[in-house]
Amino acid sequence: VGEAIAKKATELVTTGKLGYYENLKAEFPEGITNLLAIPGIGPKTANRLSGELGINSVDALEQAVKSGRVAKLFRLGDKTADNILQQIQALRRKDQRIPIGDALPVAEEILGALRSMPGVKNLTAAGSLRRFRETLGDIDLMGTADNPKEVIDAFVTLPHIGQVLAQGSTKASAIASGGLQVDLRMVEHDSFGSLLQYFTGSKQHNISLRERGHRQGLKLSEYGITTIATDKLEKFAVEEEFYRRLGLQYIPPELREAQCEVERAEQGSLPKLVELSDIKGDLHMHTDWSDGHNSIEEMTLAARDLGYQYIAITDHSGGRGIAHGLDEERLKKQIAEVRALNERLSGIHVFTGIEVDIRADGSLDLPHEILSKLDIVIAAVHSAMNQSEERMTKRVLNAIENPDVDIIAHPTCRLLGEREPVAINLETIFQAAAKNSKVLEINAMPDRLDLNDIHAFRARDIEVKLAIETDAHSTAHLGFMRFGVGVARRAWCEPQHILNTLPLEELLAFLGGDR
């Protein structure tokens, strides 16, 4: 360290400031560095925005673009102005993870459009999306085609795509709807398997594979597996063959997080993960009796169309006044309607139920006399979420120990990107659920995914039964089941761990006390 740097370091430590840095800052308008963080805005543009329009923040720039002031200053067209807005959205997401509920529909629209093109052989998601992480940084897509350039050209002109960040003959990056960055890579068919494996990740999983390969005298890369002694490269069109070459059972993408999946794959003892087709019904949904948008019959028919054997109608209880919750009298009427519907419809069974509020003191907001008449009782916290860990844990324990309760819904109460989980001792909750033979929910609402994969893995590990439920408030929401299944797969869940993989007769036995 030289004398000048030593002086600056001493000044910074003793005063908390650095005069040299403060002098540099004074030469630039306040907040201009915020503008420079936006891709496409350089020093000259930022200086004009600040000096001529008084814009020194991202928020101010957004408002100026929307009002047309920026377009007027720089004589920009509508598309350029829209690109600036998309870059602002992308910047705001840069330090945030994108919920899978936002990313997956965008990816599926793009994939659907490109798969219809002639000559497209393979096209799929990779990265965090393929591993079904609950949040992701961007969307990675890859595929093979007879004419890769045609696919790339079509990709950048899709209606979902805004600004193109980069484009070549086999790769492109662009900003899609909502500021999502999408990267598309077209590869050679004979290398598709190894490239898909590499770009699916995770990074630590791939490191584990490389270490294993090295011990076998092999070098792994995105292009295939090279035998070090002969420098011979093997390419893999099929991902399963890549794993087989390493002496491993195929590892599903959801498990590739460097836990113990490589060791288990070596032993051939990976779980047979639950699949969407294993789900026999949905036990948590709402109708227009409370805050849902469809009638009981409409929800039932939609579920039957999905091939379900059963559903449970679990509208909110009266404590959720904002949700038009059911009091005892309305619940009695709903029970009668459900029973009449069961007599009239065939091909599906409808369970009576309720999502009853767990009050702040741990009591339920409906009495035993009415709860005991229901087929399924789900209990959930919807209020007083700022309680201490001790009080919240005791509150939920009271519900678990209540003989009327079957399932605890969204146990941590989180909302992705909006509300942090409540303070609760989940290990205590899991142990109590196991002891009392109670079911914990994997709520499949994309903004909940609660329990998450880590918590669901622990619950499964101590033999707590889980239920994947959509919490649907409309017929369209029934499709959210796939998000819950993704969480369960990441939690290493097999069908036997999930309550609603049971056929109707077995579920009836379970609810009747055969737990």
Q: What function would you assign to each model-found segment?
A:
Residues L123-A125, G281-M285, E355:
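Two-metal-ion RNase H-like nuclease active-site motif
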Residues V1-A172, G193-L195, I207, H214-I228, ...:
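Accessory alpha-helical DNA-binding modules that contact the DNA backbone or grooves
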Residues F132-L218, E222-T287, H293-I313, G318-H349, ...:
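Charged catalytic cores and adjacent phosphate/nucleic-acid-binding surfaces used
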Residues L129, V356-I358:
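Hydrophobic pocket-lining residues within nucleotide cofactor-binding pockets
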